[in-house]
């Protein structure tokens, strides 16, 4: 009997001691296989088969040798690289200003930086049209220019940089805060200038975080569907072209091949970010407290960084303020009289897509949040058969573009025994399994900071794994739980690229309705939908915050009442 087989039997024996845990793991493995791996494999198989069912790579080779497809591929790569470089530079300066200087208004700057992340899609695209389109407030209203073409790559770069630089900021602010400042303080005491310290100490220590942030922004740029679809014009990108070929030409095979072309760089970037960059760290950890670190106070450093943060916050406010104004005018640039007709339309004829989106998000959010924490708990605290497979399957959807997921679901669930297309179930499944990776990552990070002896004490007193997780672990990781819930709700409300292939007449959602309004140039109706979505999302975040903060408090009060 080999050691590996003995280990297998030992793990199986441990699992069988807790039948409910064993059944839970089996159920999770089944659903991850069904809703993540199966659609992914189905799409790969479909793209690599001929009409008579024979496996071949010639279809994929022909896609890469097609001049039009190749141009579209390099357009997406070029947009992703430029956005990643500019967005990471801005994100780094923004993070450095907030974490390393004593400038004012930091809470305001932090709040503004998170706004593009939790906002509906199309906001920045719509604001660019309102400001710089043919009837734009700036182009036509201020300068009288009527032939300015706002569509194309340049506008896309601006929009994507403003949309995704907050991702780089959040990543890099954590990196900068974790760097021990004692080395920098020592260099300063020895007479080194701030510039010398930055270029020889701070920047080199930040390199792993910079590369990680750049890859994350690159992935987001590649996977972005809404902005290229609205403002791309003749600048073709893979995700949008895939959608147009499938819905316009009814050619699922060609659309799938384009999605495979999009998948490859996205998956490579994800693997690099997760397994290569994360393994490289140059951060110094001395064990000394760093909370009272000295902040940079030199005016020639603080003032330019303050101006930079203020500029980008002003641009964000301008964009969002423009959309808000656009929701209250009849026809932007033509008839700017104030009206509430767009909101009357939403809450009468156009209410169903909004109700559907909220309903589906309310159902999917707690499922995704709880599943994320359970999978994180199992991955960190338990040792069982299929653990690595569960980890890979649960995190894979983060690397998959929405168009890839949508096409995979069409192919996987369009026939018996898993006929789900056109139902609410398929949309809920997309929302749940597309959004759990962030909750899992947050839960794993939180669990890594908790001493396992706390849970071991609960187990030794007779509690099973479920009781320990519910009463001990979950209240301790409620911060990660809250983040997972918020992310899931926001992404469920704002999803476009995956659900646009899966909606039906009964189950249309607000984002696809907004997209259809863009196609017929009903921009003020779209703006009104966006304003309502922002209000709904903010209200949901507030409610989730209250609900998660009460986690564990009611139980403690009940225990005190029994004494």
Describe the residue ranges of each PLM region.
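Transmembrane alpha-helical segments of polytopic membrane transport and secretion proteins
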Residues: 1-26, 274-310, 545-563
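A short amphipathic helical element positioned immediately N-terminal to and/or at the very start
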Residues: 8-13, 56-64, 338-347
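Juxtamembrane helix-boundary/capping and inter-helix hinge elements in multi-pass membrane proteins
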Residues: 66, 101-104, 177-182, 192-195, ...
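Membrane-water interface segments at the C-terminal ends of transmembrane alpha-helices
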Residues: 17-51, 65-177, 205-225, 257-274, ...
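The alpha-helix within a helix-turn-helix
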Residues: 187-188, 458
